[in-house]
Amino acid sequence: MPRKTAENVETIPVGPLGIIAMPGCEALCDKIDKYLVKWRANQASEHQQNIAFYGYQRDTYKVNVSLPRFGSGEAKGVVNESVRGFDLYIITDVFNYSCTYNMYGMEVPMSPDDHYADLKRVISAISGKAKRITILMPMLYEGRQHKRSSRESLDCALALQELVNLGVDNIMTFDAHDKRVQNAIPNGSFENIMPTYQMIKSLAVSYTHLRAHETLMNL
């Protein structure tokens, strides 16, 4: 029997892919969606009739959600299409203060607490119908409040526990302030991705004078 390698092992999708863009992440999700549509369109189409690959190739993977707000500033999450059995990825930037909403006639910038509350609203609106939910949070909510040094709240630990209790399967973040905060959810999946190489590569591309070996060594 021939040995199986990474080249000939096929992975069956968990479910139809769905991408949810939270406020402030629309442009990023558009780029991700366009890349996935193009990449999957170029894949072999031999499994198109296989029920396990249902929804593998689509025109878009974005899921239409809305977060209407009342005049009091209160909001609700609405999922405008079925996500039953989907493999959902929710992308949120909780530190994006360029997002605003109207409260009592005033434009108010969204705080990390507002972004986090919206995230929970969308998860609640999904109502447990998705096959798997993954949260992609580039900067971890309350990541700097990762330990207690006096009579303090453990906000990051509480947030992680809340998300897991709401049915989130995976939480992904970049360069967490202290990755040991994952101890708050020992049975949950917490991925701390280090973007060091990508940052150096981006700097070298954007600032050509940094490409010289001697210059890089002096950084």
Placement of each model-derived feature along the sequence:
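PRPP-associated nucleotide enzymes
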Residues: 1-214
